[in-house]
């Protein structure tokens, strides 16, 4: 019995020595790539802001990415056409910037913030159904610079938006 305990202790001691030799005495600092991947993971929803007209926006380094909410895409049904602005278009908060058409309805799109369009999701021209398949990732609509980033404070958090949707469904 004592022989088994002795062997077990030697194995544990060896494991600890091996583990400690691989530990760096410097503090662990995540790389920029690791931080970027964390930001684009599940935490992304916590920084997404919503409008009462069901658009969402996320920002990174002064550029906003705009799309429609899951609630909106479900209400629309299968999106068959997207009308989006040209790059360089200047938008004011709540200004109409395009439209989505589905088999059962059409819906105007409104800018959640003031700014200038820097990119349009060209993939939607050939595959507008991306809005339905991936409204928060591949189905984004436009990217824009922000004229007044403080306007973000006036938008709803994900939690507030969920409460808002529940209130209008009742």
Swiss-Prot record:
Keywords: Lipoyl, Mitochondrion, Transit peptide. Binds 1 lipoyl cofactor covalently. Its cofactor is (R)-lipoate. It is found in: Mitochondrion. GO terms for biological process: glycine decarboxylation via glycine cleavage system. Residues 63-145 form the Lipoyl-binding domain. The keyword Mitochondrion applies. SUPFAM superfamilies: Single hybrid motif. Disulfide bonds: none annotated. It comes from the Eukaryota. Coiled coil: none annotated. PROSITE patterns: BIOTINYL_LIPOYL, LIPOYL. GO terms for cellular component: glycine cleavage complex; mitochondrion. Residues 1-45 form a transit peptide. The modification N6-lipoyllysine is found at residue 104. Its main location: mitochondrion. Belongs to the GcvH family. The glycine cleavage system is composed of four proteins: P (GLDC), T (GCST), L (DLD) and H (GCSH). Interacts with GLDC. HAMAP family: GcvH. The glycine cleavage system catalyzes the degradation of glycine. The H protein (GCSH) shuttles the methylamine group of glycine from the P protein (GLDC) to the T protein (GCST). Has a pivotal role in the lipoylation of enzymes involved in cellular energetics such as the mitochondrial dihydrolipoyllysine-residue acetyltransferase component of pyruvate dehydrogenase complex (DLAT), and the mitochondrial dihydrolipoyllysine-residue succinyltransferase component of 2-oxoglutarate dehydrogenase complex (DLST). PANTHER family: GLYCINE CLEAVAGE SYSTEM H PROTEIN, GLYCINE CLEAVAGE SYSTEM H PROTEIN, MITOCHONDRIAL. This is Glycine cleavage system H protein, mitochondrial. The gene is Gcsh.
């Amino acid at each position: 019995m004592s022989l088994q305990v002795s062997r077990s202790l030697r194995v544990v001691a060896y494991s600890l020595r091996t583990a400690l030799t691989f530990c760096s005495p410097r503090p662990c600092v995540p790389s920029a790539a690791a931080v970027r991947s964390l930001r684009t993971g599940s935490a992304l929803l916590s920084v997404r802001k919503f409008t009462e007209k069901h658009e969402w926006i996320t920002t990174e380094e002064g550029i906003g990415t705009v799309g429609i909410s899951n609630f909106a895409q479900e209400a629309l049904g299968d999106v068959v056409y997207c009308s989006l602005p040209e790059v360089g278009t200047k938008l004011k908060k709540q200004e109409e910037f395009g439209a989505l058409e589905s088999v059962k309805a059409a819906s105007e799109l409104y800018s959640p913030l003031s700014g200038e369009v820097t990119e349009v999701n060209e993939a939607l021209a050939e595959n507008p159904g991306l809005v339905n398949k991936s409204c928060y990732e591949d189905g984004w609509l436009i990217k824009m610079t922000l004229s007044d980033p403080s306007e973000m404070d006036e938008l709803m958090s994900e939690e507030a938006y969920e409460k808002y949707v529940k209130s209008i469904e009742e």
